[in-house]
Amino acid sequence: MKASLLALLLPAVSARNVNLAGDTQRPMTHEEAAAATYHIEISPGNTRWVTEDEKWALRRKGINFFDITDHPDLGATINTLVGPPKKKAVFPKKPTYQDAVKPLFTNLSKSHLEENLEKFTSFHTRYYKSDWGRQSSEWLLGKVQETIKEAGAEKYVTAKHFKHPWGQNSIIATIPGKTNQTVVIGAHQDSINLFLPSILAAPGADDDGSGTVTILEALRVILQSKDIVKGKHPNTLEFHWYSAEEGGLLGSQAIFSAYEKERRDVKAMLQQDMTGFITRTIQAGLPESVGVIVDFVDPKLTEFIKKIITEYCDIPFVETKCGYACSDHASASKAGYPSAFVIESAFEYSDNHIHTTDDLIKYLSFDHMIQHAKLTLAFAYELAFADFPALEKGK
C-alpha cells in the first residue's frame, strides 16, 4: 500500500465519535483517535489500557476481551447486600412441552433464513461505528417489527432499539409473560473486518449473520403459538440483537449493566453466535453436531440445553470451549445472570472465514441453521412456561 494512500485511510480507520455540546458528535481526528485508549479485560481481573489498533491486533491473535471502559462496574452488585440476594439457578429436569413445540417445527423455513441473510449480508459492513452498521440495524429493527405485525401480535409484542452513542443500536423484542421473570435469547448483529474495519467489506454471513437470522426465525415461529402471543406463559421472553460485540461486547454490556442496576430478574440467557458452518467438521470425518460451550457458562443451564438438543434436534451435541469473553453471553454472566452459548460445531472446527471479506453465505448450511432454530424455539418455549419459583423451592 502506498504511503499516500495509507495517509488517506488512517483517519477513517481510527475514526471515533467525540461528544460536543448539545449532544452532537463529530468524528475524532486521526491525532485524537491515536491518543484514545480503552480499558480491556482479557481474563478475570486481568486488565490493561490499549489503543484501538491494539484492540484489533489482539483480536487478530484470537484474544477476546471485555472493553470495560464504559462499564467498569458490571457485576458489582452480585456480592453486595443491596436488595434481595440472587437465587441459585434451577432449571427443569427434562423438557415437557413436546406436544406444543414439535408441531411448530414444521413452520421453520430455510427460505426465510436465506432471504433474510442475503439482505443482511448485502451491507458493505456492519461495523458498529460505520453508517452501514447504523443502516443494517435500522433494517433489522424494521424486519423484527414486520415479523411481529405479520403474526398479528403487535398489540402484545414490542420491538425497539436500545440506543448506543456509536450509532449502531442494539434491538430488543419483548413477548410479555405473566411475570417479569425473563428469559433472554441473543445474537450479535455487527460484523467486522479486522484489518481495516472502517473500510474493508465485512459481510459477516456466519459471524454473526447466521445467529441473527436464526433467532429471528425462532421468533417468527414462536409467535404462531396463540398461548405465547396472548401471554399465557408465566415468564417474559426477550430476543436481543446486540451491537458492537466485536468491539469488546459493548452492546450487551450496556444492556446487562442496565438490567443489573434495575435488578431485572433474568432467569436464563442463551447466545447463538455462528450457526451455519459445518465444512471443517465433515472434512474431519466427524458427525454434524451442535457445539455446546462448557467454559465460563452456567453449568446447570448448559446441562438443560444439552437435554433440549437431545430431545428436539436431529443431530447430537459436542462439548467445546471458547475462552473468556468470547461472545455476549459473557456480559449476562458477569452481571450475575445464568448464561449459556451454543455454536455451530466444536470450536476448533468453526468457521475460518470470519472477520474477513470471505465470510460468505456460500460456505453455510441452512439445514444446520434449522437445527439451531429448533434448539432456540424449544429453549424459549420450555423456559417461557417453566415454574421457576417452584423449581427454586425444590418442587
Curated annotation (Swiss-Prot):
The gene is LAP1. It comes from the Eukaryota. Pfam families: Peptidase_M28. Binds 2 Zn(2+) ions per subunit. Glycans are attached at residues 107, 180. Belongs to the peptidase M28 family. M28E subfamily. Its main location: secreted. Keywords: Aminopeptidase, Disulfide bond, Glycoprotein, Hydrolase, Metal-binding, Protease, Secreted, Signal, Zinc, Zymogen. Zn(2+) 1 binds at residues 188, 207, 273. This is Leucine aminopeptidase 1. Extracellular aminopeptidase that allows assimilation of proteinaceous substrates. One of its GO terms (biological process) is proteolysis. It comes from Podospora anserina (strain S / ATCC MYA-4624 / DSM 980 / FGSC 10383). The keyword Protein transport does not apply. Its EC number is 3.4.11.-. GO terms for cellular component: extracellular region. Zn(2+) 2 binds at residues 207, 246, 355.
